[in-house]
Amino acid sequence: NRLLYNGVLGEKTMLGHCIHISPAEMDILRETGTMVCHNPESNMGNAVGCSPVLQLFQKGILIGLGTDAYTHDMLESLKVLLPMQRHNACLPNVGWREATGMLFENNAKICARYFKKPLGVLKPGAAADVIIMDYKPFTPFSHENVDGHMLFGMEGKNCRTTIINGKVLYKDREFVGIDEDKINAFC
């Protein structure tokens, strides 16, 4: 209520974690258009609880997936998210669509509230942010089961090439145009 009273909540506000949040507070977030970023590994690592992701979805709150700097690997966070939500709900068949939706759809929607150029989508005029994975699936791979491969097969270390805003920054597992020794010396 303090955040609402002081005018902090709104369509450009993102709250992290939201672990101990009541249904009434969820309603406030929905009514103000406030977003939530769930950071499952951080929550587990700090033993602070589990965000009620499925309830936030049911309330119509835009919730994305983050890392809280606990990892740099979004696929790792995705893999933790699904079993964590299933464990929290004591239901082994929930959360599939929500988990991948948070990373691939909702994170793009969140970015759209902050940036003019579309991010997280492949379409003309959008930032050409793409990763190319070196992944050899053991089972058939198609657009219909890509989520399963992301959750159970791929890992961040499979990333072979990274393109950001149309510029290749990492190719064949080597940085392009970046002096790693110079950066490491500075660190």
Name these PLM-found stretches:
Residues N1-H72, A89-V94:
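Active-site core of metal-dependent hydrolases
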Residues N6-V8, P52-P137, L151-M154:
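His/Asp/Glu-enriched, well-ordered alpha-helical/loop segment
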Residues A127-G177, N184:
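C-terminal cap of metal-dependent C-N hydrolases
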Residues N39, N43, N106-N107, N165:
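Asparagine-centered polar/low-complexity signal
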Residues T13, T67, F104, T161-T162:
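Ser/Thr-centric signal marking residues that sit
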Residues V48-G49, L75-E76, E144:
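Short Asp/Glu-rich motifs
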Residues C18-I19, R86, K136, K167:
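Flexible loop residues that form catalytic
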